[in-house]
C-alpha cells in the first residue's frame, strides 16, 4: 500500500470486518472528526459454523461452483447487515445517525503475485445497504491493487492518520490472521506489507487438534521452543523451497500461502 492518504470526513461511521481467523464479524461504531477517532460502540457477531466451513473450504482451494460462490456472497451480505443492525440496537441509534458503513468483505482468495495480481472478497454490499438503509462502501483491496498496491490499504492508512509524526520514524505491527507492518516515515508516503502468518495457523492447529476455535487465554501448555527459533527454521525452510525469490516477495501473502500442511511442517521442524 503506498497511495496518498486523504483527510477523513467528520461523522459517525460503522466499520465491518471479518478476517482470516473467521472468529466472528467485528463491527465498530466510531465518531470521526478530522484526525480524532472516538469509539462509541462495538460488537462481535457470531459466525455460523457451517458458513465458516464453507469459507475455509473455498480459501483452501476446494472445488466449488459459481452457484456456491453466489450463495456465499449473499449469505455474507445478510450476515454483515445483521451485525450492523445489532450494533445499532446496542447503541440505541438509527440509520439516520450514521454517515456510512465501510465493509471489507470476507477474503476467500488473495494472489498479489499473480500476473495480473488479483484478490477476491465476498459479501454483497448492495444487500447491506438495502437492509440497513445506510450508504455502504467497500471493495477496498481490489482498488488498491489496481493502483499498484498489495491489496491491503486500510490498516496502514488508519495507522498513518492516527500515529504518523512529523519527525519520528514509527512502525506499527498488526497481528491478525496474517500479520502486517505499517511504516510511518516523515515526509514519505505510508507503506504497508504482510510479514507472515499471525494467529491463523495457531487457530487452525487448535481447531484440528483440540476442536476449539482458538487457544483462549493461552490455556494450552507452553511450547518447548521459542518464537525466534521457530521463525529462523521457517525462514530457512522458505529459502530452501523458494530459492529464486527474494525474501521481500514473501511480504505479499494470503491464507493460501500457509495451508495446514505448511503448519504441520513448521511444527515438526520446531519440535
Swiss-Prot record:
Q: Name one GO biological process term.
A: peptidoglycan turnover
* Organism, scientific name: Yersinia enterocolitica
Q: What name does this protein carry? A: Uncharacterized anhydro-N-acetylmuramic acid kinase-like protein
Kindly give the PANTHER family that the UniProt entry links to this protein: ANHYDRO-N-ACETYLMURAMIC ACID KINASE
Which InterPro entries does this UniProt record tie to the protein?
Anhydro_N_Ac-Mur_kinase (IPR005338), ATPase_NBD (IPR043129)
Judging by the UniProt lineage, the source's domain of life is Bacteria
Family per record: Belongs to the anhydro-N-acetylmuramic acid kinase family.
Q: Please name the GO terms that the record assigns under molecular function.
A: ATP binding; phosphotransferase activity, alcohol group as acceptor
Amino acid at each position: 500500500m503506498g497511495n496518498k492518504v486523504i483527510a477523513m470526513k467528520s461523522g459517525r461511521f460503522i466499520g465491518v470486518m471479518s478476517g482470516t481467523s473467521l472468529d466472528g464479524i467485528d463491527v465498530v461504531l466510531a465518531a470521526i472528526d478530522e484526525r480524532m477517532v472516538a469509539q462509541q460502540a462495538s460488537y462481535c457477531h457470531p459466525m455460523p459454523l457451517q458458513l465458516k466451513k464453507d469459507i475455509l473450504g473455498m480459501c483452501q482451494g476446494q472445488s466449488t461452483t459459481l452457484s456456491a460462490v453466489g450463495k456465499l456472497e449473499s449469505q455474507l451480505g445478510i450476515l454483515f447487515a445483521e451485525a450492523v443492525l445489532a450494533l445499532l440496537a446496542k447503541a440505541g441509534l438509527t440509520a439516520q445517525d450514521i454517515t456510512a458503513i465501510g465493509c471489507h468483505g470476507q477474503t476467500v482468495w488473495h494472489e498479489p503475485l499473480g500476473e495480473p495480481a488479483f484478490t477476491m472478497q465476498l459479501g454483497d454490499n448492495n444487500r447491506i445497504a438495502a437492509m440497513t438503509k445506510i450508504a455502504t462502501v467497500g471493495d477496498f483491496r481490489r482498488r488498491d491493487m489496481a493502483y499498484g498496491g498489495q491489496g491491503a490499504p486500510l490498516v496502514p492508512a488508519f495507522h498513518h492518520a492516527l500515529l504518523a509524526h512529523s519527525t519520528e520514524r514509527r512502525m506499527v505491527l498488526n497481528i491478525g490472521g496474517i500479520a502486517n507492518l505499517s511504516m510511518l516515515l516523515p515526509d514519505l508516503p505510508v507503506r504497508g506489507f504482510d510479514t507472515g502468518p499471525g494467529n491463523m495457523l495457531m487457530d487452525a492447529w487448535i481447531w484440528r487438534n483440540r476442536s476449539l476455535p482458538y487457544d483462549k487465554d493461552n490455556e494450552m501448555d507452553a511450547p518447548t521452543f521459542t518464537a525466534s527459533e521457530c521463525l529462523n527454521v521457517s525462514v530457512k525452510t522458505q529459502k530452501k523451497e523458494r530459492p529464486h525469490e527474494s525474501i521481500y516477495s514473501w511480504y505479499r501473502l494470503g491464507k493460501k500461502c500457509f495451508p495446514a500442511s505448511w503448519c504441520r511442517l513448521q511444527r515438526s521442524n520446531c519440535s
